[in-house]
Amino acid sequence: MELRLYDTLSREKRTFTPLDPSNVRMYVCGPTVYDFAHIGNARPVIVFDVLFRLLRHVYGEAHVKYVRNITDVDDKINDRAARDFPGLPLNEAIRKVTEQTEKQFHDDVDALGCLRPTVEPRATEHIGEMRDIIDRLIAGGFAYVAADHVLFSPQAMNAKDGVLPRYGALANRSLDEMIAGARVDVAPYKRDATDFVLWKPSKPGEPSWPSPGGIAVQGRPGWHIECSAMSWKHLGERFDIHGGGIDLVFPHHENEVAQSCCAFHTERMAETWMHNGFLQVEGEKMSKSLGNFVTIRELLATDKFGGKRWDGAVLRLAMLKTHYRSPIDWTVEALHEAEKAIYDWSEFTKDATPAPCDEVIDALADDLNTPKMIAELHGLRRVGKPAELLGALQLLGIGRVFRQTIEIDVNAQALIEARTAARARKDFKESDRIRDELAAMGVVLKDGKDADGKPVTTWEIAR
C-alpha cells in the first residue's frame, strides 16, 4: 500500500515517505484555551485523528508520535480571565480559564471519538525553548531587538544564501504582496511592514518571563514562536507532517517555517504540510452576528442545531463525508443522513467480530479520501460484510449508535433536567438518586458549563 498526501508547500500529492519509519512524527496546531471549541474547530481535530489512526495502522502504534499543542498564553485568554473573574489576580484568573477550557475541549473531542495525541504540550511549559530559538535568530541576523520587542525580519531571511526556503513559499506570496496587504498603522519600532513579533513586553499583571536578547523588562512570547518551540522540543528540528486549518497557512505556518528553518539552518521544517478547508453553516459563514455560531458542546448537549442533540459519532461521520481539503457545508440534513447510516450500520454489525477491510484503507491512503471511504462502507453493508464493516468503523473511530438510544434520549433528557433542578436547589440527595437511576439505564453523565458559564450536563451510553 502506498500512502499519498497532498503537500501545501509543493502543491502536489506526493508519496509519503517518513524520515524514520520507526518514528513517524506529526504536529497539529491545537486550541487556544479561552472559550468552547466551535464546530469549525472540530474539523482539524477529526481529520488529523483519522490520519493518526491510519499512520498507526500502517507503521504500528508504538512508531507514531502525534503532538497537538495547547496555547495557554494569549491576549484572548487574558481578556476572558479579566471578564470572568474580575475579583481575582489576573494570573490566578488565567489559570482558572485555561484549566476549565482545556477540560471542556478534551470532553468534547473525546465525545467525537478522537484519540488523545501522544503529547499535548502547553505553551507556558516551553518558554525556555522559545527564548533559545529567539536568541539563535538574533545571533544569526534574522531577528532584532526594538522597544523591548524582538522581531523577525523576512527581508533578512530572503537575503541569505544557502539552504533556507524563501519566506512566502508556503502561502505562495511574495514580500511585495505582503507589504501591499499590510495594515497602514505599522508599529513604529518595526524596520519593515512584514516584520513580525517573536517576543513582546508584558503589561502590569500579565503573565511574564525573563526576556531573551538582553532585554531588561520581562515579557511574553508571540503566537508563532510557541509552535516552533513545542514542535522542536517534542519532534526535533525536522519532522514528517505539520497540519492545521487552511486559515493558518498565513501568517502562522509561514512564520513557523521562517523561525524554525532559520534557527536550525534547514530547508524544511516539515516534510509534508496538510491543511483542511473552511466550514460554513447552512450555506453561510459561521458567525455570532448571523446567529449560526454553534459549539461542539451545543451540538452534543442541546437542541440548538436541528432541534435535537447529536451523538458524537454522527458529528464525526458528517464531518468526514466531505474531503478534508474541500470546504464543508454543515447542515442539519447532512447530520440526519449520517445518523441514519450509523443506525443502520450499528444494527447490521451488532453481532459481528471485526475483520480487516483493505478497500477502506486504500481509500484513506489516497490523501484521506473520506468520501470514497464512506462509499466503501455503504458497499460493505450492501454486499453483506458485517465483519469488515465493523473493522472499518473501529479503525475510523466511528462508534456504534443504536436506535433504542432515541427512547433513552427522551427519558434521559427529562431526568437530566430534573437533576439539574435538584442541583440548583442544592438537593444533592435527589441529584444523586437521579444519577443512579440514569446509571441503571446505562447512561453516563458528564457535568460541565456552557459558553456562558451556566451548568450543563452531557451524557453518553456506557460502552
Curated annotation (Swiss-Prot):
Binds 1 zinc ion per subunit. Zn(2+) binds at residues 29, 227, 252, 256. CDD domains: CysRS_core (cd00672). It comes from the Bacteria. One of its GO terms (molecular function) is ATP binding. ATP binds at residue 288. Its main location: cytoplasm. It is an enzyme of class 6 (ligase). Its cofactor is Zn(2+). Monomer. This is Cysteine--tRNA ligase.
